[in-house]
Structures are given as C-alpha cells and as structure tokens.
Amino acid sequence: MRFVDPGVGTVNEGYLLEVLSEHGTLIASGREICYRKEFGPQDDRFIGDAFGLFEADGLRSLVGIEIKDWAAPVTPKIARDYLETYGRSCDFVYLAARRFLPGVASVRNLGLISLEGPKLKKAANRLSPDRAGWDFVVRQMAPDLARAPLHPHQRRLMGP
C-alpha cells in the first residue's frame, strides 16, 4: 500500500491513524494541513502530512505524522528536524517510513510507524506544543467544534 501519491499528496492516512488507538478515540483528522500560522521564505516545512485529534479521559491530544514513503532509509537528522517542526503544534509526533537507520529509534520523544503493515514500532512521548500552534491546526481539521479545543494546558473554558 502506498501512502503518498505524487499528484495528490498524502493518501491512506486512515490506516496510520488506526495504529495509534492508544491515544484514545479519533474525533477529527486531516491531511496536507498547514501547521504554522506564520512562516517565512526560509521555512521549507509548513504543510504536515497527516494529523489526528484523539480524545481519552476528557483530554484531547493532537498527533502529527510525517510520512516518508520512499525506498531510502530515514536518517536521525531528518527525524530530529521533523520532531522539532511538528512539535511546535502537536502533543505527539510520529515518523512513518519503510526503513529507518538504527539511530532514529534513539531520537527522544519521537514515535515511529513502519509503513509495512502499518505497525507501531515505537510510541511517542507527550510534548508541550505552543498553544496557538495547536489551536491553529485543530481549527483547520475541525472548524465545526462547538468550543475551543481542549488542550492539556487549558485553564479555563473558552467559547466558539
């Protein structure tokens, strides 16, 4: 199964999100979403491959997945770069690929998904994303939510 179509972008992301059921119930998802409200000409990354908003025990978590559906193995440098980029807006970050170099598994906080299956290889650890970045991505995926998204750092109820 392929997860990237050159003419379309990300495809079949639902199979990857199913692997992440440990994060709770999937309540919204999206693909090819801008994950930064502001970006400059030097920024080469501002569109995320796949996102899922999960809810467990009244807590919503935004999960970002960068998909590398290519033959070459993913390097630790690529893994760290995407963790930093997605980590600005996501509670959990995963890298999905067919092959990983050995050092990728030691990148702290990053989760790994094998595209062969797909299968969860390593669970991600919770990050502390910027609240505005988190809200920006969630509102693109689920603009019809009646209230502002619940976030781990939220202290008061916010209206529409």
Where are these regions (language model features)?
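Alpha-helix C-cap/termination motif
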Residues: 23, 57, 88-89
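Beta-rich catalytic cores
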Residues: 46
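Non-catalytic C-terminal interaction segments of nucleic acid-processing enzymes
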Residues: 1-8, 18-28, 100, 105-160
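A short acidic/basic microdomain associated with nuclease active sites
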Residues: 24-43
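Ordered hydrophobic segments in well-structured contexts
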Residues: 27-28, 34, 49-53, 62-64, ...
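Catalytic cores of nucleic-acid endonucleases
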Residues: 69-112
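Conserved catalytic cores of phosphodiester-cleaving nucleases, focusing on short active-site segments
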Residues: 50-52, 58-76
